[in-house]
Amino acid sequence: LKTILEYLDTPPYLRKKVYPKMWILKHAGVLPPIKSPHHKALINSKDIKDIEIRFGFVVKQNDSLYVDVGLQKLIRYNGTQLGKKVLVKISNKGKLLAQDISKEEIDGYWGYEVQLSDSLSALLENRNCEILMTSVEGSPFTKHVEDLMRSLKMSKNLLVVFGGPKFGLRKILESENERITQKPHFLNMFPKQGTQTVRLEEAILGTLSIVNNYLNA
């Protein structure tokens, strides 16, 4: 699952370079595109007038490093990450030059990262953020909107946690027999949902849309 998620986050023009033929990605072609801002279209290098930010893949050519960023030619790379996917800022000062840039330097959303945790309790422990745990067993979201938004404005960071297809968050925590010290917001994002459960992919999109709507209100 981690590989599939990382594959989806990779711009289409880089996927064949970053991911060789893998059985786990055999049916990845039928997955819907995410159309994230960093999934940019192929363009001509002549169209870069000032600054362009793109993901690329670093290769070596004639003892120099270049980065493939989905243009019709490779761009000279001022870095050291040979054979890796990199996020670069391309500047045009007579010649195109690419150098590393971090997501924190970019204004707006620029893709996600995938991390693995040994357990749910380990994921929740020592988090410097507000924690929203979604569950049909939680309190209705609409009754706690003000508290959650007030907390978010103070912390600036939010961890949203969803249950799995077979077990909800309460059962998962009970099975781990661990206590979490930080008090989370345990909320039902879809009260009166009319079904026993909400599909995970629908819950993710719905929850993020609801939270984003209130944050930008």
Language-model segments: residues:
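Post-transcriptional modification and biogenesis factors for structured RNAs
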Residues: 1-217
